[in-house]
């Protein structure tokens, strides 16, 4: 029987589900899944949303406004809802909501939300590609689009201030250096480490730094922004 080609619908939203397993909990005694693993799940769902909309290869450009509102226990079903908020010439601003539920109850409640920006790339040249414009169709979509657009100026102002700073080793601030080996499974078909994997590494290093300084167990509650 010959294969039949079916055109994929260009939808502005994607929902992926994951099962939170014991191996997703970073250290013994933690109340739930590590923040880095949650960010990895978000990156996968947001990538699926971006690739579906643009119909091409995409790369993570920015992740920010990350709010962790509660821990996700091992054994929960995790649902990541990603949708286009607005588009630029080659960029797609995607809002993401993470919810989880005890499978015995099936009641999903929010655990995290954040914004991810992807850029569409030509898989052959690596240059950015134009994407279809997203036009909000109702009041809620317009509200989300306006909120996403309002953050652009703030991000640029922060980046400008950071570029003007001079960073040296003359500091008493606590610091820690972690090294990771990028495995073949960490690399996407474009030849680069997945953005979600890089975010998981950042979370692990941050966790080690805060626990060493405080002498207590710590959890991620907020991340202002990660630019790739």
What are these regions (language model features)?
Residues 3-5, 9-17, 72-77, 85-158, ...:
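HotDog/MaoC-like acyl-thioester-processing domains
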Residues 22-23, 60-65, 69, 128-131, ...:
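Generic secondary-structure boundary/loop-capping signal
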Residues 29-33, 38-44, 51:
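N-terminal, Lys/Arg-enriched amphipathic/low-complexity engagement segments
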Residues 37-41, 45, 197-201, 205:
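Short amphipathic alpha-helical face segments that pack within enzyme cores
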Residues 42, 66, 96:
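Conserved GNAT-family N-acetyltransferase fold
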């Amino acid at each position: 029987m010959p294969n039949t080609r079916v055109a994929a619908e260009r939808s502005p939203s994607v929902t992926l589900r994951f099962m939170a397993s014991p191996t997703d909990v970073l250290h013994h005694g933690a109340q739930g899944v590590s923040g880095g693993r949650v960010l990895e799940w978000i990156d996968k769902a947001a990538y699926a949303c971006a690739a579906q909309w643009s119909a091409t290869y995409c790369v993570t450009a920015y992740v920010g406004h990350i709010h962790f509102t509660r821990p996700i226990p091992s054994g929960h079903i995790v649902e990541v809802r990603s949708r286009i908020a607005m588009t630029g010439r080659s960029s797609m601003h995607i809002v993401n909501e993470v919810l989880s539920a005890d499978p015995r109850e099936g009641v999903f409640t929010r655990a995290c939300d954040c914004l991810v920006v992807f850029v569409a790339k030509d898989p052959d040249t690596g240059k950015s590609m134009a994407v279809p414009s997203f036009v909000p169709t109702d009041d809620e979509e317009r509200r989300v689009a306006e909120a996403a657009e309002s953050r652009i100026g703030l991000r640029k102002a922060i980046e400008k201030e950071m570029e003007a700073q001079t960073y040296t080793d003359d500091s008493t601030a606590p610091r820690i250096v972690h090294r990771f080996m990028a495995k073949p499974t960490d690399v996407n078909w474009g030849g680069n480490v997945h953005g979600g994997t890089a975010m998981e590494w950042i979370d692990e290093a941050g966790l080690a730094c805060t626990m060493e300084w405080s002498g207590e167990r710590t959890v991620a509650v907020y991340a202002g922004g990660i630019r790739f």
